[in-house]
Each structure stands twice: as C-alpha cells, then as structure tokens.
C-alpha cells in the first residue's frame, strides 16, 4: 500500500525549502519566518510518522477513548492490522477522528531508533528537533516579535538540519526492504523534473546574517543595477 502521509508531507517539505530559500534571498519578514518554521515542523512530523506507519509500528496512534462496542472493535482491528497504511487509508472520516497520533516530543525520544542506520554511530538530532519544536510552539501558542523570532543562529541550525534530514530521507530503509513503495523518497539519486522541488543537497551554513541576505538579495541587486545605469 502506498504511504498515506507522503503527499501531505512532500507539500510541506517543498514549502519549507521555498521559504528557506526566500529567507536566504533577503525576505526576512516575520511572515516568511513563521511559514518556514511551520512548514518544516509539519514536514518532519509527517515524515517521521510515515516511517512508523511503514514499519507497522503501532505507537504511531491510539484510539482516544473506547466508548462503545464499535470503538472496542476499532481498537482491536488497529492492533491486529499488519499494514497500517492500508488500515488508515480505508477508515471512514468518523473512525479516523477517533485516533490521537503520537506527539512530536515522543517522536524526538524515538528518533535515534526510528532513523536507525541513517544516523552515524553516536549521532543525535535531539537538539535540532527540540529547537524546531520550541519555535513551532512559540509561533503557534504564544507571543513572538519581528526581530526576535528565529534568530540568525537558529535559522543556521535549521538550515543545516534540513540538509541532514534530507540525507536521512534518502537513506532510510523500512523493515521490509523489498517493498520499494515504503521508502521515503519516490526517486533514487538526484531528483529531476517535477521531483526537483524536494531536493536539498546544499552546503551547510557556517553563519547567517539577515542584513547581509537583504544586501545580497536579487531585489537589492536589481535596484543597484537600475541606479548605476542612470
């Protein structure tokens, strides 16, 4: 069965790349910063949940509360399911609404086992994932301000995390290694054509400056060209 979360996940991942590139091109407004964090968090969460689904790991979700016999049967069917992608794909919207999915902080706790051999020995992405969670919580649930949300250092960390996470997407293997539909990326090697929007084989940033990004932006260069032509 085709992974059920990936269409949504790829939309979010492609959006995160666009907003990341926009910020690097000097569009450092709060709107772009919020959308970058939101899209990246959404993509990472969905992809990690998809990994759990592809490995038929039932920790991915739970029935909220068993209220009647139908709910009890749904719970039993869930734990008996051997193809979680197919199980969730065939549920009605009403039954889907009865599930709570795993929380992001729990995904952080599981990430080393979940990513498996895609991580180097002793490697951890806990710091980066916790930063992403903190920024997402702040922009969703509490006060943020232009100039203080997503610092230059934080943007640098998340940019470089995206490079590492994309490598994980490239190399991650499901338990059933022979089922190629269960791999995360729908292509091998460098993406081409329509898939090119998902690639993130970039060079890591050693530092980042919003001011420098604005000065070096396409718009600033265009204005400079117009002024110099007079």
Residue ranges, per PLM feature:
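Flexible secondary-structure boundary motifs
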Residues: 60-130, 134-135, 145-146
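A structural signal for alpha-helical segments
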Residues: 4, 31, 35, 124-127, ...
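Polyanionic, low-complexity intrinsically disordered segments
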Residues: 127, 131, 144-230
